Design a protein with these regions (language model features):
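Active-site-proximal, substrate-binding regions of enzyme catalytic domains
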Residues: 20-23, 40, 44-101
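Histidine- and aromatic-rich ligand-binding microenvironments
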Residues: 4-5, 11, 94, 111-113, ...
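Alpha-helix capping/helix-boundary segments
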Residues: 8-9, 39, 117-118, 136-137
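Acidic, PIN/NYN-like endoribonuclease modules and their adjacent C-terminal/linker elements
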Residues: 1, 119-147
């Protein structure tokens, strides 16, 4: 299994200057791609915020909540995330960690909570490779960071 981080998916969905690099990373590292519930949440949230800002001028979480309450969840975001997961044949796995493990990894490897959960989930499933532009994962000894 190969873990795909949020930033790789984001650059593919949103056609950024790093899109080609993200696609190349996937092409050069074929395998059984997985994301956990943290990445699934992050890509939906980040894509929603990007969509609302660029299509409707909505900025900030509070304004986004008001917009969604009034107009409903943007189908374009759901469709884009769903299509990418399907196209790349990404499997969704549950995030797994204990409270004690989380605190230990936060402190020992100086990670943000979401990254610590991802690292622990990878450890639990025996995943040793993560595709990401986030250099913080290089501090995690059981993960090989690509690129």
């Amino acid at each position: 299994m190969i873990f795909v981080d949020t930033n790789i998916l984001y650059h593919i969905i949103h056609k950024t200057p790093s899109t080609d690099k993200a696609l190349t990373i996937l092409e050069e590292n074929p395998g059984d791609y997985v994301i956990d519930t943290v990445v699934h949440n992050e890509i939906i949230y980040a894509s929603t915020m990007h969509y609302l800002e660029h299509k409707h001028g909505v900025k900030g979480a509070y304004s986004a909540r008001k917009w969604i309450k009034r107009h409903g969840y943007p189908k374009e975001v759901i469709d884009a995330v769903r299509e990418l997961i399907k196209r790349l044949n990404i499997r969704l796995i549950s995030s797994i960690y204990t409270e004690g493990e989380l605190y230990k990894v936060l402190i020992e490897f100086r990670l943000l909570p979401s990254d610590a959960i991802i690292a622990l989930t990878c450890k639990h499933y025996g995943i040793n490779t993560i595709l990401t532009f986030d250099g913080d994962f290089k501090r995690v000894p059981w993960l090989k960071v690509v690129p």
